[in-house]
Swiss-Prot record:
Transmembrane segments: 48-73, 103-122
Topology Cytoplasmic: residue spans: 2-47, 123-773
Domain of life: Eukaryota
Topology with respect to the bilayer: Multi-pass membrane protein
InterPro entries for the chain: Carn_acyl_trans (IPR000542), CAT-like_dom_sf (IPR023213), Cho/carn_acyl_trans (IPR039551), Cho/carn_acyl_trans_2 (IPR042231), CPT_N (IPR032476)
Regulation of its function: Inhibited by malonyl-CoA.
Name of protein: Carnitine O-palmitoyltransferase 1, liver isoform
Lineage: Eukaryota, Metazoa, Chordata, Craniata, Vertebrata
Active site per database record: H473 (proton acceptor)
Primary location group: mitochondrion
Phosphoserine: modified positions: S741, S747
Gene designation per UniProt: Cpt1a
Length: 773
C-alpha cells in the first residue's frame, strides 16, 4: 500500500558492495513538520501559562512596575520604605558588585516582589467581589446603586482580554451550606409529595440527623472544602458517573441534534469534511485558550471554564470496580467508523490542519472502500454500550497487547470519534413526528455498535448528510458540548459554506496520506462477549420511548410579555402536563449549574413545590377563577426562580446531602435519613439546553436555522426525561424520553399534555400566538 511506504522515513539493504541506504524525503519532511508542530504547541502552552499565571495583570505590567521603581530611585524617592536598602546590603558581601549594579538589581527584585503582591491583591479582591451574589436575587430589570458600584469594581479587577482559563484562580470556592438549612429546605421540598404520616416520620429522621450525626459529617466536609478546589465535583464525577457499573448508553450519555429544517448539502463526505474542520478549528481555539470565558450580567461575572480541558482527546476507560478518564494533551488523528470498519485519519499535513475539501476527500475514500470487516470488528463498539464489568475484563484479556492494543489506543487517543452512518435521518415533511423521533433515537443509541460510547464525543454524519453528536457525560456537562455545537453549525453554514454542486470549497490534494484500516485480531471468545453485550444493549435501546418535537405556537417572546422567566413558565407547564398525564405529583429534578464557583458542575432544582402544586390543582379545578390561577402562577414562578438562584449560588439541597452521604460511607456510619433521601426516584428529570452564542445566528433573517437541541434517556424506569431548548423568540424544542416497558408512561401522550399545558397557561394572560398585546 502506498501509504505504508510513505510512513517509512528510510530503508536500507545489505549488498556485496555495502549498505544501500534510501531516504524518503517526504517522510522526513512530515516528521520535521510534526516536530515543529509539537514544539509550537508546547510554546503556546508555556506562553499561555505565563499570561494566565499573572492575570489579572499582564506580563508587560512587570516592566512598567520595575521601571517605575528604578525611576523613583533616581529621583531619590524610596517607594520601598527602606526595603530596597536592605536588599542592597545583603546582595554582595564581597564588594565585587558596583553600587550602580546593586541599585539596579535591588530595584528589579523589589519591583518584581511589588508586582507579584499587586497581582495577588487584585486576584484576592476579585475573588472576594465574585463571592457576592446579591445581584442575582434583585428584582428583574432593576439594579441598585450598590450593585452598579460592585459591577464597576469587578470590571476594574478583571483585567483586559482574559483568556479561557484566566479567571480560574479568581473564582470563589463552592460554599458548604449549614446542615440545618439544607435539612429545612429538603423538608420543604418533599412536603407536597408526602402524606401527613410519612412527612412526620421523615421530619423526625431529618431533625435527628441535623442534631446528631449531621454536624459530625459536616465537620469532615468543611475540612475537605478548605483544601479541595471544589468539595463536590471530584466525588460527583467518581461516584455518580465512573463507579456506575451499568450501561452508559441511554443511562448516562446524551445527544445533540442539528438544525431542523436546513441541510446545506446532501453529500455525506462534504458535510463531514466541513463540520470536522469546524470542530478542529474550535479545538484549536481551546488549545490556544483563545476562547472567551463565558460571563454573565453584561459580560461581567465569569463562569468556570475547567470543563473545556477534556472536551477533546478524551476517553472513558472501563475498570472492574471503577472507570477512569484518559486525556492526552494532543491528538493528531481521528478514528472513523463506516460499515463495520475502523479507519485512522490524520488531521495534519505539511504542518497544518487538513482543509475541508481534503477532509471530504478522506471521507469519500472511506465511503468508497469496499473491504469487508474483520471477524468481530463490525460490532466491537457494543462492548462500550453494555455493562462495564464485562467490557473491562474483555479489554484486559484481549486488548492489552499486540495489534488489538495498538488499534484500541488509536480509538481511545483520537481527538474524537466519527461515524459515517449508513441510514438517513432528519426531518421529513411527509412524516414529521416519526422522522424526528427516529433522528433522536439514532443519536441516543444508534444500532448499539456504531457509536464508541466511551469517547468524549462521537460525531455522527448520516447518509443524507444530517449530523449530530453523542456525548459521554462524566468529563463535563451538556453546556460545554452545546457551546461547541453552536460554533460548528454556524461555522459550517455561514463561514465555510459549500460550492454550487454541494462539495466543500477548495481543491483536492493527492499528496495527503490515505486513511488506514485499524487491524484487529478478535478471538471467538471475545466475539461471544461482544454478542452478549450487543444483546443486552439492544434490549435497553429498544425499550426507549423517545419523542422529540418542535413547539412553534409561541416562544420566549410571548412568554416575556407575561413578565416571567421562560424557564419557570416551562417548568410549571411540565408540572401541569405531568399531573394531566399521571394524576399525581412527583419528585422533579431540574439541572442547574454551579459554575459561578471554581470547578463547579451542577446542582438540582426541586421544581415540584407546594406553590407549583397549588397552581396545578387550581388549573385542574373548573371552579377556580382565572384571577386565582393567575395569582397562583405568579407565586409559583417566583418560588421556582428563588430556588434556581439558591442552587446557582451554592445553597442547593442535593449535592450537599450527597457529599454528607459519601462522608458517612467513609466513616462507616449508617444514616437512615441520608439513605432514604438518596434512594428517592426522580420520576420527572428535566434540563434546559442554554443557547450561549446568540450572536452566531440571526433568526430574524434566517428563521429556519433553528437547532433542535438535544436530549437524554429516562432516569427512572417509570418516569420521564425531558429536555428543552428555547431558540430565538418564537421556537421551543422538546425531547421526552421514557420506557416502553413501563405501563404508566407514554412519551407521545406526555407530549400532547405538554402542548396543551403550554396553551392553558398562556391563555391565563389573554395572549395568543399572534397577540400584539
Amino acid at each position: 500500500m502506498a501509504e505504508a511506504h510513505q510512513a517509512v522515513a528510510f530503508q536500507f539493504t545489505v549488498t556485496p558492495d555495502g549498505i544501500d541506504l534510501r531516504l524518503s524525503h517526504e517522510a522526513l519532511k512530515q516528521i520535521c513538520l510534526s516536530g515543529l508542530h509539537s514544539w509550537k504547541k508546547k510554546f503556546i502552552r508555556f506562553k499561555n501559562g505565563i499570561i494566565t499565571g499573572v492575570f489579572p495583570a499582564s506580563p508587560s505590567s512587570w516592566l512598567i512596575v520595575v521601571v517605575g521603581v528604578i525611576s523613583s530611585m533616581h529621583t531619590k524617592v524610596d517607594p520601598s520604605l527602606g526595603m530596597i536598602a536592605k536588599i542592597n546590603r545583603t546582595l554582595d558581601t564581597t564588594g565585587r558588585m558596583s553600587s550602580q549594579t546593586k541599585n539596579i538589581v535591588s530595584g528589579v527584585l523589589f519591583g518584581t516582589g511589588l508586582w507579584v503582591a499587586i497581582i495577588m491583591t487584585m486576584r484576592y479582591s476579585l475573588k472576594v467581589l465574585l463571592s457576592y451574589h446579591g445581584w442575582m436575587f434583585a428584582e428583574h430589570g432593576k439594579m441598585s446603586r450598590s450593585t452598579r458600584i460592585w459591577m464597576a469594581m469587578v470590571k476594574v479587577f478583571s483585567g483586559r482580554k482574559p483568556m479561557l482559563y484566566s479567571f480560574q484562580t479568581s473564582l470563589p470556592r463552592l460554599p458548604v451550606p449549614a446542615v440545618k438549612d439544607t435539612v429545612s429546605r429538603y423538608l420543604e421540598s418533599v412536603r407536597p409529595l408526602m402524606k401527613e404520616g410519612d412527612f412526620q416520620r421523615m421530619t423526625a429522621l431529618a431533625q435527628d440527623f441535623a442534631v446528631n450525626l449531621g454536624p459530625k459529617l459536616q465537620w469532615y466536609l468543611k475540612l475537605k472544602s478548605w483544601w479541595a478546589t471544589n468539595y463536590v465535583s471530584d466525588w460527583w464525577e467518581e461516584y455518580i458517573y465512573l463507579r456506575g457499573r451499568g450501561p452508559i448508553m441511554v443511562n448516562s450519555n446524551y445527544y445533540a441534534m442539528e438544525m431542523l429544517y436546513i441541510t446545506p448539502t446532501h453529500i455525506q463526505a462534504a458535510r463531514a469534511g466541513n463540520t470536522i474542520h469546524a470542530i478542529l478549528l474550535y479545538r484549536r481555539t481551546v488549545d490556544r485558550e483563545e476562547l472567551k470565558p463565558i460571563r454573565l450580567l453584561g459580560s461581567t461575572i465569569p463562569l468556570c471554564s475547567a470543563q473545556w480541558e477534556r472536551l477533546f482527546n478524551t476517553s472513558r476507560i472501563p475498570g472492574e470496580e471503577t472507570d477512569t478518564i484518559q486525556h492526552v494533551k494532543d491528538s493528531r488523528h481521528i478514528v472513523v467508523y463506516h460499515r463495520g470498519r475502523y479507519f485512522k485519519v490524520w488531521l495534519y499535513h505539511d504542518g497544518r490542519l487538513l482543509r475541508p475539501r481534503e477532509l471530504e476527500q478522506q471521507m469519500q475514500q472511506i465511503l468508497d472502500d469496499t473491504s469487508e470487516p474483520q471477524p468481530g470488528e463490525a460490532k466491537l463498539a457494543a462492548l462500550t454500550a453494555a455493562d462495564r464489568v464485562p467490557w473491562a475484563k474483555c479489554r484486559q484479556t484481549y486488548f492489552a497487547r499486540g495489534k488489538n492494543k495498538q488499534s484500541l489506543d488509536a480509538v481511545e487517543k483520537a481527538a474524537f470519534f466519527v461515524t459515517l452512518d449508513e441510514s438517513e435521518q432528519g426531518y421529513r415533511e411527509e412524516d414529521p413526528e416519526a422522522s424526528i423521533d427516529s433522528y433522536a433515537k439514532s443519536l441516543l443509541h444508534g444500532r448499539c455498535f456504531d457509536r464508541w460510547f466511551d469517547k468524549s464525543i462521537t460525531f455522527v454524519v448520516f447518509k443524507n448528510s444530517k449530523i449530530g453528536i453523542n456525548a459521554e457525560h462524566s468529563w463535563a456537562d451538556a453546556p460545554i458540548v452545546g457551546h461547541l455545537w453552536e460554533y460548528v453549525m454556524a461555522t459550517d453554514v455561514f463561514q465555510l459554506g459549500y460550492s454550487e454542486d454541494g462539495h466543500c470549497k477548495g481543491d483536492k490534494n493527492p499528496n495527503i496520506p490515505k486513511p488506514t484500516r485499524l487491524q484487529w485480531d478478535i478471538p471467538g471468545e471475545c466475539q461471544e462477549v461482544i454478542e452478549t453485550s450487543l444483546s443486552s444493549a439492544s434490549f435497553l435501546a429498544n425499550d426507549v420511548d423517545l419523542h422529540s418535537f418542535p413547539f412553534d405556537t409561541f416562544g420566549k417572546g410571548l412568554i416575556k410579555k407575561c413578565r416571567t422567566s421562560p424557564d419557570a413558565f416551562i417548568q410549571l407547564a411540565l408540572q401541569l402536563a405531568h399531573y394531566k398525564d399521571m394524576g399525581k405529583f412527583c419528585l422533579t429534578y431540574e439541572a442547574s449549574m454551579t459554575r459561578l464557583f471554581r470547578e463547579g458542575r451542577t446542582e438540582t432544582v426541586r421544581s415540584c413545590t407546594t406553590e407549583s402544586c397549588n397552581f396545578v390543582l387550581a388549573m385542574m379545578d373548573p371552579t377556580t377563577t382565572a384571577e386565582q390561577r393567575f395569582k397562583l402562577f405568579k407565586i409559583a414562578c417566583e418560588k421556582h426562580q428563588h430556588l434556581y438562584r439558591l442552587a446557582m449560588t451554592g445553597a442547593g439541597i442535593d449535592r450537599h446531602l450527597f457529599c454528607l452521604y459519601v462522608v458517612s460511607k467513609y466513616l462507616a456510619v449508617d444514616s437512615p435519613f441520608l439513605k432514604e433521601v438518596l434512594s428517592e426516584p426522580w420520576r420527572l428529570s428535566t434540563s434546559q439546553t442554554p443557547q450561549q452564542q446568540v450572536e452566531l445566528f440571526d433568526f430574524e433573517k434566517y428563521p429556519d436555522y433553528v437547532s433542535c437541541g438535544g436530549g437524554f434517556g429516562p432516569v427512572a424506569d417509570d418516569g420521564y426525561g425531558v429536555s428543552y431548548i428555547i431558540v430565538g423568540e418564537n421556537f421551543i424544542h422538546f425531547h421526552i424520553s421514557s420506557k416502553f416497558s413501563s405501563p404508566e408512561t407514554d412519551s407521545h401522550r406526555f407530549g400532547k399534555h405538554l402542548r396543551q399545558a403550554m396553551m392553558d397557561i398562556i391563555t391565563l394572560f389573554g395572549l395568543t400566538a399572534n397577540s400584539k398585546k
